[in-house]
């Protein structure tokens, strides 16, 4: 007798909203999902704020969502931990942060603060940058420079001017710091090995090459004049007397204050790896600190806030129970179904196979809303035919990645393609008397319009997400669940007792 696979299908960025305006989820033609919502038990889950270990009212995101789902418990996020340490004062005693500042003071070298200057709270927070400036001032550092990456995805697309202005006012007030470069996150924070983008950011940081401006505010307005919003600001060097304010040089200290790893890794590698093949560059000798651990294999890097260890995540526990599992996603979300789902552990568990499907090489995903969903689907259907896996974790990236473009019609098409794909997968699993749980990690494409301004919205939302139980067995689901309740539910269906570390509760009544 063949296996009865249990699949968790994560529709990334697929939230629930009753409002029709800008709701690509509601507008999409999705006969399969509509049928499942009528036929099968379903509920809604909290996927933002306190429900996922973030500050109240803070939108969820993919890293946080997958961490909470995989851990089966509320995972208190780096944003919360770092903010708390600033408020309570431990931040200013952090040995690793202090060592970077001390290195600059002792050697009379520069202290460079790199990161996303945004209160979005997904990759970084401006309050953490302000905390670093306070620390530098306390320690007597005088040569402190900010390399500002502009957002436009987790906040409105043209809001950088406001955040840069706020930072320039703070610099004036505290009497320390200068903005040296401005780069859109499209360049500085690529995560898909598009090294030609990262190279432009690197050239601005290290060689002072790129667009030129007399101030950070001017860099932003120049970009707007050229029709480029915050995410796409071409790396720009701020000049004084026709010379760069500064560049990153041998002997300097660098603190990369992004706390989310996935979009900080590539630039960190370019600045630190002994052997680097992304593009031609000279290896610098730096005191380089990252706010959190971006990747255990990074060379020449010190970590200020180490990751917490989560014992008995879903993947680890299922492996201990001698069950086999498959993780599958396209490049954009591969780290989420592997590294983040496993509690920040890179190595696969025993009997955990992985399928990485390359994401399409397009400038922005509105140009190809289907992304690689059909390739993911055909691969997982082939794997199901092998009758090998007890559990499959699958992520469809489209609703999130296309939702981030702010282009409604593209997001609608993205959801329609995902609906077509998931219909094929669900049919196959039901044929095998298996179970499919359909959920999301956070909202996005259900709100493509900023209700207050009418402008396109590119950020995540605080909306709840669906949880569908698609199976030939009938059951009832409870209300008021959170993402941490998904793993205990999966274990119950697999006939496994949940480990004591999982504090989430099964959603089955």
From Swiss-Prot:
Keyword Isomerase: yes
Gene Ontology terms: biological process: glucose catabolic process; glycolytic process
Catalytic activity reported: (2R)-2-phosphoglycerate = (2R)-3-phosphoglycerate
Active site: 62
Binding residues for Mn(2+) 1: 400, 404, 460
Cofactors named for this entry: Mn(2+)
Pathway where it operates: Carbohydrate degradation; glycolysis; pyruvate from D-glyceraldehyde 3-phosphate: step 3/5
CDD domains, per database record: iPGM
Keywords assigned: Glycolysis, Isomerase, Manganese, Metal-binding
EC number(s) reported in the record: 5.4.2.12
Subunit comment: Monomer.
HAMAP family assigned: GpmI (MF_01038)
Full protein name: 2,3-bisphosphoglycerate-independent phosphoglycerate mutase
Organism: Clostridium kluyveri (strain ATCC 8527 / DSM 555 / NBRC 12016 / NCIMB 10680 / K1)
Gene name of the record: gpmI
């Amino acid at each position: 007798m063949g296996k009865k696979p249990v699949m968790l299908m994560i529709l990334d960025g697929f939230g629930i909203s009753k409002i029709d305006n800008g709701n690509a989820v509601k507008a999409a033609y999705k006969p399969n999902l509509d049928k499942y919502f009528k036929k099968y038990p379903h509920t809604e889950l909290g996927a933002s704020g306190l429900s996922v270990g973030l500050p109240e009212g803070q939108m969820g995101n993919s890293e946080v969502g997958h961490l909470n789902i995989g851990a089966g418990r509320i995972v208190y996020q780096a944003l919360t931990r770092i903010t708390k340490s600033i408020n309570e004062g431990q931040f200013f005693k952090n040995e690793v942060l202090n060592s970077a500042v001390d290195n600059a003071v002792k050697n009379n070298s520069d202290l460079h603060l790199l990161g996303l200057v945004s209160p979005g709270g997904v990759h970084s927070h401006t309050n953490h940058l302000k905390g670093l400036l306070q620390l530098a001032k306390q320690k007597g550092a005088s040569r402190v420079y900010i390399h500002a990456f502009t957002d436009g995805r987790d906040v409105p697309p043209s809001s950088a001017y406001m955040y840069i202005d706020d930072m320039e006012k703070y610099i004036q007030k505290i009497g320390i710091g200068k903005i040296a470069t401005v780069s859109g996150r499209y360049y500085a924070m690529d995560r898909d090995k598009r090294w030609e983008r990262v190279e432009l950011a690197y050239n601005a940081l290290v060689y002072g090459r790129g667009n030129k401006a007399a101030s950070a505010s001017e860099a932003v307005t120049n970009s707007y004049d050229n029709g480029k919003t915050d995410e796409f600001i071409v790396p720009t060097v701020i000049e004084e007397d026709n010379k760069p304010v500064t560049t990153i040089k041998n002997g300097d200290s660098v603190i990369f204050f992004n706390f989310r790893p996935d979009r900080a890794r590539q630039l960190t590698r370019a600045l630190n790896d002994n052997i680097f093949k992304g593009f031609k560059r000279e290896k610098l000798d730096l005191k380089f600190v990252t706010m959190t651990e971006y990747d255990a294999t990074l060379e020449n890097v010190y970590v200020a806030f180490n990751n917490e260890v989560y014992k008995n995540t879903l993947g680890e526990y299922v492996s201990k129970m001698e069950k086999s599992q498959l993780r599958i996603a396209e490049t954009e979300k591969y780290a989420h179904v592997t590294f983040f789902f496993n509690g920040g552990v890179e190595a696969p568990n025993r009997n955990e196979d992985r399928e990485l499907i390359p994401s399409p090489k397009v400038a922005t995903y509105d140009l190809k809303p289907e992304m690689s969903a059909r390739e993911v689907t055909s691969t997982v259907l082939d794997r199901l035919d092998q009758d090998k896996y007890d559990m499959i974790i699958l992520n469809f990236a489209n609703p999130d990645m296309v939702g981030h473009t702010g282009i409604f019609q593209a997001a609608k098409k993205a959801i329609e393609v995902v609906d077509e794909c998931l219909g094929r997968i669900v049919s196959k699993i039901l044929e095998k008397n298996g179970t499919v749980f359909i959920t999301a990690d956070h909202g996005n494409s259900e709100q493509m319009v900023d209700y207050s301004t009418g402008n396109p919205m590119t950020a995540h939302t605080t909306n709840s997400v669906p949880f569908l139980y698609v199976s030939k067995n009938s059951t009832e689901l409870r209300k008021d669940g959170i993402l941490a309740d998904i793993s205990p539910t999966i274990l119950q269906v697999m006939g496994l007792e949940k480990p004591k570390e999982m504090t989430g509760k099964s959603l089955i009544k």
